[in-house]
Amino acid sequence: PDFVVDTPQVVVEGPGEGHTLNPGEPGSIFDDAVDVTGVGQFYRADGFVCTGTLINPRTVLFAAHCVNDAGEDGFGAAVGNIPAAFAFQADALDGLRSWIRSGYSSVPEDYVYNIEQILFDPDSLARPEARGFLESDVALAALDTPASDVPTWAMLFSPLATPDSIDSVSGTGYDVRVVGYGRSGYGESGSFQGTDFRRRAAENVLGALASLNDRNEWLFGPGDYGLPQNLYQTDFDDPNGTNPFDFNLFRDGAR
């Protein structure tokens, strides 16, 4: 279906409906209650940004589509390639400035760490029409300095247990918190706001472990959609229940 856009977006209710993108306002989703959480902003000196999670003091897990256009050997300021770094403050702009001023070096006091090496799954490039998204979208970054003062996150390698039942309020029962940097917006408008280097967080319900083939076949009928990768998926529900495009794909209430 030509009108389905298969790219991740982070959107919330509009202002006056409980949430806002703006820091310092009631209902803000700016994630600054704890400044350094282990979720960080990825910078590339050629202008790209992404989000990653620190899984040990030297390693960040993030998405292959952030880097697979340049190749694994395309990064590293020390060898004359594209400089790249991760910064872990809630507002990562100061970290970016410190990194640039230092000549693309780690500045631990600002929680910004230069990247020494990047590895990504080459299968993320297997289908050019996917633009590096969806399949095998996994990369690892090795920091040149241990981020010893930054919390690390554990990894789950097994599927979540299948719920015994699903209801129209709590869905699967798996409440999740979505955290990251980058574009953001509201349900009616989509992700209209560009990157401002701030970390934001919102809650949702995990809807399904399923492929986009499964979704499309349910919506549009059988077809060769070419999207077999299983993904944990969420939907965005209109809190007022009036939007004609909100058909509550995963049978859970708005959060």
Q: Predicted segment positions?
A:
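Terminal peptide-recognition signature
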Residues: 40, 52, 58, 62, ...
